[in-house]
A protein has these predicted regions:
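Zinc-dependent deaminase catalytic domain
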Residues: 1-274
Length: 274
């Protein structure tokens, strides 16, 4: 009989990284068959993501039927947990630990799923052929917020026609406008199945995939609902100069969110309600 192979979390991480300049985040589903889900992330990558973010988003994208159970397992990561990581864990997962010579032992599952590149399949709203085009260049904040509200109409229609499928797709839209009043990007909340895909997060990640840059300094982000902890942290990280955030990005929201996930966020002193 072959003995069961056990390794510490630190040993598992080293095995997955293979000496490369990468961070890794992983969790283990212990049910039969046991599965190790992991995601790698380059420490030099400036994209608005991380090993933890890639792992959580990847699980929701690839395992929609059991994702909410999977993400309740503890996540282990070699990288220091950032505000962005903690925000996503609080909103869409359960718990995580940094690996510092961790001695906890696990049986190594034969089945291992690499989720590092899952996010590459997400599509920017502005890449759709029939997306709304704004002619509001130079208009005031109220006009841009009204445009954002208008964008939520497809979600409202979907909820009315298929309430069971779209019940958790709250009608929320986010709009990014340059300092000269040009529409740069917009996105909708699509979190019915993937709990991470809030409007602001969709916007930030799709903008980076297209332009490979942070959100332009002096731009404005309009969102129809006050950002939660996850989205606030993502926006804060995506700003061109976090040390001077008010200049880098102005965040303006419409409806207040009194829930616990929208309290004491990274944007607490850097956003205003319209």
């Amino acid at each position: 009989m072959t003995s069961v192979q056990e390794k510490t979390t630190a040993e598992i991480a080293r095995q997955l990284i293979l000496g490369r300049d990468l961070d890794v985040a992983f969790l283990i589903e212990k049910k039969d068959p046991a599965t190790l889900y992991f995601a790698l992330h380059s420490r030099k990558d400036l994209a608005p993501t991380s090993a933890v973010v890639r792992l959580i988003q990847g699980i929701y994208a690839t395992e929609p039927e059991k994702s909410r159970v999977l993400v309740r397992n503890r996540i282990y990561t070699t990288a220091p947990l950032t505000t962005m990581d903690r925000g996503m864990i609080q909103v869409a997962a359960k718990r995580a630990s940094e690996i510092h010579g961790n001695s906890e032992l696990f049986e190594i599952p034969e089945k291992q799923v690499d989720l590092s590149e899952t996010l590459n399949g997400l599509t920017s709203a502005l890449e759709y052929e029939n997306h709304p085009r704004s002619t509001l260049a130079g208009c005031d904040d109220k006009a841009w917020m009204a445009f954002a509200v208008q964008l939520t109409r497809p979600i409202q229609v979907s909820r009315e026609s298929q309430p069971a499928l779209f019940l958790s797709n709250r009608p929320v839209a986010a709009v990014l406008v340059s300092k000269t009043g040009e529409l740069l990007e917009w996105a909708l909340n699509t979190n019915a199945v993937n709990k991470t895909l809030h409007a602001e997060l969709n916007l930030v990640q799709s903008f980076y995939r297209k332009f490979k840059t942070k959100l332009p300094a002096g731009s404005k982000l309009f969102t129809t609902l006050k950002p939660c902890k996850m989205c606030a942290a993502m926006l804060f990280d995506a700003a061109e100069d976090m040390r001077n955030f008010k200049v880098a990005l102005e965040v303006i929201y419409g409806e207040d969110d009194p829930g616990p996930n929208a309290r004491n966020t990274a944007l607490e002193n850097f956003q205003r309600q319209l």
